């Protein structure tokens, strides 16, 4: 369905996108990362030289250190996956990112670029009520590009579209 393609196709611009790496985006744990949002929706792991294999959802919570990222692991799972984002301009950093997955009966929703590192939610249903509840519960902040209120509104819209 193109989850990873959709997550990387609009990265800032051609020049930056051609230099960006999946490992760099994940290891950096950047709040604006399209890639991190997508990988959190998947059954994914990182292998660290000293830290071993760590689930992606735990890795994003870890304190930054000088460990080395060896590889990114994605377990195969048939399912449905959607990635959506909103940008002020096509080549800008995302204002908000959303990824959802339904893989083997496990449903996940991820809200990223809030601003802040992407946040994972395990959900029971993919419906309008769940989209509205997540938009209300998720922690958002205002910054120079977007207000907290607009982020909440946008999260509800993007999650609703992704669930449809």
Predicted regions and their residues:
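C-terminal structural segment of proteins
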Residues: 1-164
């Amino acid at each position: 369905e193109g989850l990873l393609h959709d997550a990387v196709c609009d990265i800032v611009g051609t020049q930056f996108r051609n230099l960006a790496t999946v490992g760099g985006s994940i290891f950096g744990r950047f709040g604006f990362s399209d890639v991190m949002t997508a990988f959190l929706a998947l059954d994914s792991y990182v292998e660290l030289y000293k830290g071993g294999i760590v689930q992606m959802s735990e890795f994003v919570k870890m304190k930054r250190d000088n460990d080395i990222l060896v590889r990114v692991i994605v377990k195969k799972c048939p399912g449905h996956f959607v990635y959506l984002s909103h940008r002020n301009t096509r080549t800008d950093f995302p204002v908000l990112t959303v990824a959802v997955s339904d893989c083997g009966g496990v449903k996940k929703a991820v809200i990223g670029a809030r601003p802040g590192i992407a946040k994972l939610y395990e959900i029971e249903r993919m419906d309008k009520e769940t989209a509205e509840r997540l938009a209300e519960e998720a922690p958002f902040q205002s910054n120079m590009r977007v207000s907290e209120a607009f982020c909440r509104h946008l999260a509800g819209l993007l999650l609703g579209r992704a669930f449809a």
